[in-house]
A protein has these predicted regions:
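Basic, polyanion-interacting recognition surfaces, primarily
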Residues: 227-346
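Bacterial Sec-dependent N-terminal signal peptides
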Residues: 1-27
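Glycine/tyrosine- and acidic-biased, solvent-exposed loop/turn segments at the edges of beta-strands
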Residues: 22-231
Length: 346
């Protein structure tokens, strides 16, 4: 009886060894034509990189790729050879990183991307490698940040961006990758900050700029070539707006703590019931310069200066004001910088 058991054990061991040898021989096999056949495993420095099946050199079924620590990095399901492949990638903690399909090695259909905490970060849609359909981006907290629509790899239709917690930031419209139609930007609280029209990527018509309270502060008028033609400022007098052509304004002068006087180039004056700091926020500071803490001048009205000492200058203004205007410190340096050739003749 013992001899019989020994013979059976010996036969079992032999079978196991033969089976192992056959399995080893079946791994990473190349046929006489040099084509990969059957199960394959690739190792680098003793670490498994991927494993899968080949049939006539073409991947078939499930392929798995691995991180150096042995965890699954991605799984590819070869549905019809390499012409259609469903792919899922993973973070090292095991959570899904992305999911989607390749058709002829190009992204197709919906793709989704996730954080390592399993939060959806983006949704994308493709047609044979080209962006086609809705694209949505999310914050790591899961809030929507951006929505865009593509057709044939170009932006088309309505696009939106958001502040945190999905408050609207911008709404714009595209045709074939160019801005066309209305664009609106918002302050937090869904208050419009500016709005206007685009045509073929260029601003056109009247654009409105508002303050955080929703009050209109400035308008800009553009021609069909996107060139600005007119700018208007809105001064508030006891809560009511008064529209002024910016080209007619020479100076803004502080009057007490709560008022500002706009002095026009023809000498007329308009008194606003808002302080200078509030009005200055809406000036085009490429066209106005701070002469003193209490006075802003339109650039063309600053005709020159006379040095008083290293830290101060007397500013020459046209139309002239009723008093000498002395710029000091940073304001004096700024006035000097307007005249690169040095002190001009009065």
């Amino acid at each position: 009886m013992k001899n019989i058991l020994k013979k059976l054990m010996l036969m079992l061991i032999c079978c196991c060894i033969c089976g192992f040898c056959m399995a080893q021989n079946d791994l990473n096999r190349v046929d006489k034509n040099g084509k990969k056949q059957g199960p394959w495993k690739k190792f680098e420095k003793g670490v498994l990189v991927y494993e899968g099946q080949f049939e006539n050199d073409v991947p078939k079924g499930t392929f798995k790729y691995y991180y150096p620590n042995g965890k699954v990095k991605s799984v590819s399901e070869f549905v019809t050879g390499v012409s259609r492949v469903n792919v899922t990638t993973y973070h090292e903690n095991g959570n899904v990183a992305s999911k989607g399909t390749f058709i002829n090695q190009q992204k197709d259909g919906q793709w989704k991307y996730y954080s390592d905490k399993n939060v959806l970060l983006s949704e994308e849609n493709y047609k044979l490698g080209k962006k086609n359909g809705l694209f949505v981006t999310y914050s790591v907290e899961g809030y929507k940040l951006k929505e865009e629509v593509y057709a044939n790899d170009q932006l088309n239709g309505e696009s939106k961006t958001y502040y945190e917690k999905e408050e609207l930031l911008t709404v714009s419209h595209y045709i074939n990758g160019k801005l066309n139609g209305e664009l609106i930007t918002y302050y937090p609280g869904n208050i419009p900050s500016q709005k206007g029209l685009y045509y073929n990527g260029l601003k056109t018509g009247v654009w409105e700029i508002n303050d955080p309270k929703g009050q209109i502060r400035r308008t800009e008028e553009y021609d069909k070539n996107g060139n600005i033609q007119k700018k208007y400022l809105f001064l508030y007098i006891n809560g009511s707006p008064q529209k002024l052509n910016q080209n007619l304004i020479a100076y803004f002068q502080k009057k007490g703590e709560t008022k500002t006087v706009a002095i026009l180039k023809n000498g007329n004056k308009i008194e606003s019931t808002e302080n200078l700091n509030t009005i200055v926020q809406w000036l085009d500071l490429l066209e106005f310069v701070r002469v003193t803490p209490n006075l802003y001048a339109e650039m063309s009205c600053v005709r020159g200066y006379k040095n008083i000492d290293a830290q101060s200058v007397r500013v020459i203004l046209r139309p002239a004001l009723e008093y000498d205007v002395i710029a000091e410190g940073n304001e004096a340096a700024l006035i000097r910088s307007l005249f690169a050739t040095g002190e001009p003749k009065e």
